């Protein structure tokens, strides 16, 4: 008789996804980040739920309620530090996961990849509205600057901004709705994650060689379930160390000052994980152009599968494109640095060059390099 996990309607789904799933035998540690993102999402939802029990979404008490959580609630300081730094780990895992996808050609599973890009946009939206909730200086001014970008939309821009704000400035209505969005979006992310996995399991995982691995598969459990647990342990230890030893390392000191609409901070900047996109936004002198470039910096990922010109899937045996891939990583690091710098020379020109290089690498240089590699190998 077949075991219950293979026959029960609900357990059968879990079994096919987590136990008897055929997985390539050679997938490396770079394939761990999907499960780590699942861990981050669960961790963020749980810590966020406990924070929401004590938080008040009113401009008169929001800042004080966060202070109250840290001072008076049992382990509130720990829950808050885990939640704030958990967001950083979430984005570290996302960027490594995307980097893995770009390097090994996983983007050729188009449905999985496109849902992944939508997931990235949703997580970015969640993080943005979440950053506004403590109602510190950077929360308030970050919300003002970023929502104001919508005014660049032709014809309806002004109306759109007032609609988002719920008034004529970032005020109580804005904070209340941002709290509602911040509570709702993670559950939408969880639902989209299910779709992401559904489409992934239609094709099976890619592998470091970029070759068909149907002839060499092993079951997910116990091999990769234990491998994932090792990754979980590593991330939990790192997150706990960050939350306990240097909880404010990645935060902005300005956010320890309550929001004041009359005083603008000297340098308005988002959290570190948005700096690369913020640098691209700032490098274009035109408002609408900047907004479009900001959107394009993420949506460019959607055209990567269309621009795949190589006869090989992964970069494992493509040294020229490998070099360009690492140039792209360095470029994003430069953009991240520039995003945190004031708008003055030489930072302006460096940001503009890095922004141009970012798009050129995706849209022009890497597809052309792949064609050259095909020609050298006599594969065209």
UniProtKB/Swiss-Prot annotation:
What does the entry list as the binding residues for heme b b562? 83, 182
Highest taxon listed in the record's lineage = Eukaryota
Sites binding a ubiquinone sit at 201
Q: Does the keyword NAD apply?
A: no
Per its UniProt record, the required cofactor names are:
heme b
In the record's cofactor note, how is the cofactor described as bound? Binds 2 heme b groups non-covalently.
* GO biological process entries: mitochondrial electron transport, ubiquinol to cytochrome c
Q: Where does heme b b566 bind?
A: 97, 196
Spans traversing the lipid bilayer:
33-53, 77-98, 113-133, 178-198, 226-246, 288-308, 320-340, 347-367
Cell location: Mitochondrion inner membrane
Sorted keywords for this record are: Electron transport, Heme, Iron, Membrane, Metal-binding, Mitochondrion, Mitochondrion inner membrane, Respiratory chain, Transmembrane, Transmembrane helix, Transport, Ubiquinone
Q: Name one Pfam family in it.
A: Cytochrom_B_C
Query: Which Gene Ontology cellular-component terms appear in the entry?
Result: mitochondrial inner membrane; respiratory chain complex III
Tell me where it mainly resides.
mitochondrion
Which protein family is named in the record? Belongs to the cytochrome b family.
- UniProt subunit comment: The cytochrome bc1 complex contains 3 respiratory subunits (MT-CYB, CYC1 and UQCRFS1), 2 core proteins (UQCRC1 and UQCRC2) and probably 6 low-molecular weight proteins.
Misc: Heme 1 (or BL or b562) is low-potential and absorbs at about 562 nm, and heme 2 (or BH or b566) is high-potential and absorbs at about 566 nm.
Provide the protein name. Answer: Cytochrome b
- Which species is listed as the source? Pagrus major
């Amino acid at each position: 008789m077949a075991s219950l996990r293979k026959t029960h309607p609900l357990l059968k789904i879990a079994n096919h996804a987590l136990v008897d799933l055929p997985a390539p035998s050679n997938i490396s540690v770079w394939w761990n980040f999907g499960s780590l993102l699942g861990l981050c999402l669960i961790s963020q939802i749980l810590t966020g739920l406990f924070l929401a029990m004590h938080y008040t979404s009113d401009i008169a008490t929001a800042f004080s309620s966060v202070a109250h959580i840290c001072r008076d609630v049992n382990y509130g300081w720990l829950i808050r530090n885990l939640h704030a730094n958990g967001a950083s780990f979430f984005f570290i895992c996302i960027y490594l996961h995307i980097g893995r996808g770009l390097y090994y050609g996983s983007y050729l599973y188009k449905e999985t990849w496109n849902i992944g890009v939508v997931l990235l946009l949703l997580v970015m939206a969640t993080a943005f509205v979440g950053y506004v909730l403590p109602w510190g200086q950077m929360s308030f001014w970050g919300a003002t600057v970023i929502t104001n970008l919508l005014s660049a939309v032709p014809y309806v821009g002004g109306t759109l901004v007032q609609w988002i704000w719920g008034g004529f400035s970032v005020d109580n209505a804005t904070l209340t709705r941002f709290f509602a969005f911040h509570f709702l979006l993670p559950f939408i992310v969880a639902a989209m994650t299910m779709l992401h996995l559904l489409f992934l399991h239609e094709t099976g995982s890619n592998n470091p060689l970029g070759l068909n691995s149907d002839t060499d598969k092993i079951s997910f459990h116990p091999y990769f379930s234990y491998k994932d647990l090792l990754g979980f342990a590593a991330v939990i230890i790192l997150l706990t160390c960050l939350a306990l030893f240097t909880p404010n390392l990645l935060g902005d000191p300005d956010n320890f000052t309550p929001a004041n609409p009359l005083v603008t901070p000297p340098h308005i900047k988002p959290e570190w994980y948005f700096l690369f996109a913020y640098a691209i936004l700032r490098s274009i002198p035109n408002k609408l152009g900047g907004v479009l470039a900001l959107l394009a910096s993420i949506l460019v990922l959607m055209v990567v599968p269309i621009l795949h010109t190589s006869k090989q899937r992964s970069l494992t045996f493509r040294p020229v494109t490998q070099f360009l891939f690492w140039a792209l990583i360095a470029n994003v690091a430069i953009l991240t640095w520039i995003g945190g710098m004031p708008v003055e020379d030489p930072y302006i020109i460096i940001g503009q060059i890095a922004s141009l290089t970012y798009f050129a690498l995706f849209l022009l240089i890497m597809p052309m390099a792949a064609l050259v590699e095909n020609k050298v190998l006599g594969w065209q």
